[in-house]
């Protein structure tokens, strides 16, 4: 045999680590059902806040902090937007525990991770179209 066999000094490793993918896919119907049930549980537990719109003229973190405190939202918060709004997204990105996401990219993990959910009226309409 070889002098690099595993049983010898300076030999190879017998059963070394092998790369493994921990990726897990969920069926579309199951994912949609999970999102539906999470959204309804947020409504039942009063963790859903609906606002008319975020009318930010400029990118100011202070505006977003004031908006969230006026809504009496505390803790981890997910802000769902109907379409890309750079002013809102950049205003919220430096606030700890606040994440912005588009309505077409929501996932079960974020809905579970963030206690509060803040949505606009347009977002509610889009959610009703997709999940009603």
PLM ranges: what are they?
Residues 1-17:
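DPxDG-like acidic metal-binding loop motif
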Residues 16-132:
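Extended polybasic, low-complexity segments that bind anionic RNA or targeting/receptor surfaces
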């Amino acid at each position: 045999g070889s002098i690099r066999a595993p049983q010898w000094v300076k030999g190879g490793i017998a059963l070394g680590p092998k790369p493994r993918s921990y990726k897990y896919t969920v069926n579309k119907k199951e994912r949609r059902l999970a999102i539906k049930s999470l959204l309804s549980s947020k409504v039942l537990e009063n963790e859903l806040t609906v606002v008319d719109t975020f009318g930010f003229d400029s990118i100011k973190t202070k505006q977003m902090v004031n908006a969230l405190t006026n809504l009496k939202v505390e803790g981890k918060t997910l802000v769902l937007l109907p379409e890309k709004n750079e002013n809102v997204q950049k205003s919220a990105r430096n606030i700890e525990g606040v994440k912005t996401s588009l309505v077409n990219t929501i996932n079960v993990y974020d809905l579970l991770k963030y206690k509060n959910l803040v949505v606009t009226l347009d977002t509610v309409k889009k959610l009703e179209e997709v999940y009603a």
